[in-house]
Amino acid sequence: MSQSFTPRPLVIAPSILAADFARLGEEVRAVDTAGADWMHLDVMDGHFVPNISYGPDVIKAMRPHTTKIFDAHLMIAPCDPYLEAFAKAGCDHITVHAEAGPHLHRTLQAIRNLGKKAGVSLNPGTPISAIEYVIDLVDLVLVMSVNPGFGGQAFIPSALGKISDLRAMTAGRPIDIEVDGGVSAAVAGQLAAAGANAFVAGSAVFKGGTVESYKANIDGIRAAAANARGEMV
């Protein structure tokens, strides 16, 4: 391995957006059993992104079905008025977009004051310099490798360079680098080699519709990433 840092643990975070919403609790339990590390919760408002998903009440309803980390990705603007509601709903990580408001530093402070881990998400066209001066408040950086709003899009290859630059920027800090968009076993190795350690996958995890298929899908992504890091699984 060429990196000089101690790698962050590998994390597979199924995107609940790709689950069967008619069986949401059952689906959460299924991916938990299948080996998910985090549950990635895509919150969309139809304003910041061109789609609407779910809010704190639905997340609260999911919370009793798993003890795994709830990794909330707020694709909403403004986000500050809603941070407390998502914290109370049971989210462990709250990630906001660098592009969603003018006061990112204040927003990250607010998340941490709620006792939650604070994340920043970067759209494909947003440079990593957007977080340079708030890095001390960041626990997680979420790199969008598709344009946010819809699942099932194709992976944008330029995300690899951004991830590599982010890993250099965050070297020596306990910051997770998470990637979301078009993630599958086919690209997980490249992403891990670039420096990502947390992988959001929606359709690539939920295809098959059974615990067994979800486990095979999660295991495939994990194995590809681990292999690229020279690790055994």
Regions found by a protein language model. Name each.
Residues 1-18, 25-26, 226-233:
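N-terminal amphipathic alpha-helix/helix-capping segment at the start of soluble metabolic enzymes
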Residues 121-157:
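Histidine/lysine/aspartate-rich catalytic loop segments that bind and position anionic ligands
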Residues 41-110:
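N-terminal active-site wall of soluble small-molecule enzyme domains
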